[in-house]
């Protein structure tokens, strides 16, 4: 099971990304539209671990308090489609988040708080400052032979947006906590 810290997007960009989920599903392709849990929404994972992140929530909350996520947000841009993985000929299709100095600074600050206040958490190296590619997932387990079709369905136009919040996802309890 996994715990994660996830940046949330403004309503307009979330709607546009859900539109990509829906377009993939309408084309008969794997899509996160099929994941109908009320907690499922477009997000950018900034940290993930099997356990232990909950020990640093107060510290993370203090870090993000100064970033105005609840009052105007941090400006960012959803960029081009990107592919991850390829294990067993299955791919993750996502949209890259164009990295900016403020986003990278916030990400590093969250990880400093985690290392100081939850040192026992074994953070996934793909979410650490040295291994992170900021992205919003559109589809998991995309078959290799359908990649061209999927890329043709996804609108690649940049989407300017604002990060408006950070949440903690706890998969064992299937709960989210807004930070």
Language-model segments: which ranges?
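Glycine-rich, aromatic-bearing surface loops/beta-hairpins
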Residues: 160-164, 169, 175-179
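Basic, often amphipathic N-terminal segments
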Residues: 1-77, 102-159, 178-179
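Short, low-order "capping/linker" segments at domain edges
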Residues: 87-99, 176-179
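Sequence-level motif detector for i,i+2 pairs with an aromatic at +2
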Residues: 71-73, 90, 163
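Short, charge-rich binding segments
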Residues: 67, 85-86
């Amino acid at each position: 099971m996994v715990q994660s810290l996830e940046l949330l997007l403004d309503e307009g960009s979330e709607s546009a990304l859900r539109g990509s989920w829906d377009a993939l599903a309408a084309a008969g392709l794997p899509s996160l539209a099929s994941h109908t849990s009320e907690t499922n929404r477009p997000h950018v994972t900034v940290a993930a671990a099997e356990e232990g992140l909950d020990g640093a929530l107060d510290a993370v909350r203090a870090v993000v308090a100064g970033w105005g996520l609840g009052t105007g947000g941090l400006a960012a841009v959803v960029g081009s489609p990107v592919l991850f993985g390829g294990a067993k000929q299955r791919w993750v299709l996502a949209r890259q988040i164009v990295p900016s100095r403020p986003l990278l600074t916030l990400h590093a600050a969250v990880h400093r708080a985690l290392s100081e206040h939850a040192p026992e958490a074994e953070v996934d190296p793909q979410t650490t400052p040295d291994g992170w590619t900021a992205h919003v997932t559109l589809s998991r387990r995309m078959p290799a032979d359908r990649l061209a079709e999927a890329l043709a369905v996804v609108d690649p136009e940049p989407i300017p947006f604002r990060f408006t919040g950070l949440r903690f996802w706890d998969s064992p309890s299937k709960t989210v906590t807004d930070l």
